[in-house]
Amino acid sequence: MTLFVPFVLAALALWASEVVADEQQSARISVTGPLTGIDRQTGAAPARMNINDMWARGGPSWDLYVLALAELQAVDESDELSYFQIMGIHGLPFRGWSDVGQVAGGSNMAGFCPHSQTLVTHAIQIAQQYASDKAPTYRDAAEKLRVAYWDWAAVPSLPEVITLENIGVNGPNGPVTIRNPLHSYYFQNYPFTLQYMNGGPLSKQNHSTRCPTKDFVDDVAKYNTFTTVTSFQNMETDRYTSTSFESPHNNVHNTVGCNNGSMYDLNWSAFDPAFMLHHANVDRLIALWQAIYPNASIFNVVDWAGALYGTPAGYVSADTPLKPFHDDGGGYDGFHTSRSVRDISVLGYTYPELQVQSGSGSGGGNSSNSSQSLSPDELADHVRFMVNALYSNLPPQGNDTAPQLRSLAGRLRGMDRVPTRRPHATRKTWSVAISVDRAEVPLPATIGCYLGGEGQQEEQVGRMSLLAIPAEGVTHSSIPLDTALGAVGGLDLADAEEVAGYLNQTLRFEMVKGDGTPIENIGSIPSLQFVVQDRDYTPRENDMEFPTYGPASARKWGRRHGRWAMSD
């Protein structure tokens, strides 16, 4: 959905946020983003941090993050700034928030579908409880605290720290072990009496649930979105034929939630603490994409969206109010819009890859290092380098392997060698494009793509996840095949006919329902299409450029003469 991305940008500001509210809780709450920790000289905002890095480093920021989240989850659920009510903006319990109720034409069986929370205020209050010799350090950490993100694009498995039921931190009175607020949320109003929350399997659980520790199928879909998609609407939604961040986003929901976990059911998903870590990363990936393509950094089309609690079905644009998120000036009709939150710094945060380290680039933590003095082209070069280092699965081409030592800031100062251009031979890259009308499939569902020749173990090489909403509309996804094909000994990826012949013998698809039950005879689904594509691919010439791709040659996959095969 087109509003998905701006909702993330606006609502995530609440996770580590200051809010402006009247004394009456039912009155307007303005979302400003955190106002603390801003560098007074440069105006640069602190960066959100990778949850794995925060846990590994420990220290005041980690202590306060865990303690503040635990305190937030303990706030009475009747409070509009409680964990329950803020996370409830997304789906259940389907009611108003911040004086915004259901609008005429809005759905009474849907939430607002954004993502949000508060944290900094709790952290500052906790920091004041530490002994006088520690208080300044903890106060500084509290002011710079921002929500963490889980970079599932780089490490496709649940962070170990969120699988621990209990966790130890240094509290104001010394070391303490508490119930891990990143593991699950325990509902205070269980057994549920609220309308819509007292039915279904998840209503039988007094806390959010998820799969056991589970690795995902790793692919380069996220890298391909950076390198091949130059249109905002194509990047952020799976309604178009190109690859997008929406597809891996959906895969994370289904994989973390399994068949009946909180993340699998979008009405309940926001209550799982993994939800915010997940969507903070989606926000981060989009922010990096926007830095690379600054002239396409917001959608400029009018698109159709289904009814939500605060939004009737109809056309939406970059100026559509993002209810229920009131702004503090600059939005439309008192609300944030996609246009007003395009620059994430106005909401008081940034990401490490958008910070250009000064000097040797050996900075750390979430301290502010401004990139505001760079031109858009220079920042794009820097972010392309970071994306290549993180997601291309290829080593840097220069001598310096540490990305921070090869930062753009250092290069501009003459401290780093400008990477030399190395010509590379063009080869083929392979993928499968999948499309289906959701109205023809029992939702939620997952389409799996498998490869395995005679005498080889069949392996899943990718999947397309269809969430429960929206209930209709054509969805697209693209599954890269290069990694799997590259592992096949003796297969020449540059020979299109040889690869096509191999795929005819080894490629298989299946579709399963939310409970894991296979959907039989998927060939009878009228809109379901599988298209094998090959394109000429020229690797990047240096670390600040992306590879280039030629036009796609398409081979439709279908049943012919009683078996599945590709057309010529």
Predicted regions span which residues?
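C-terminal accessory segments of proteins
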Residues: 22-568
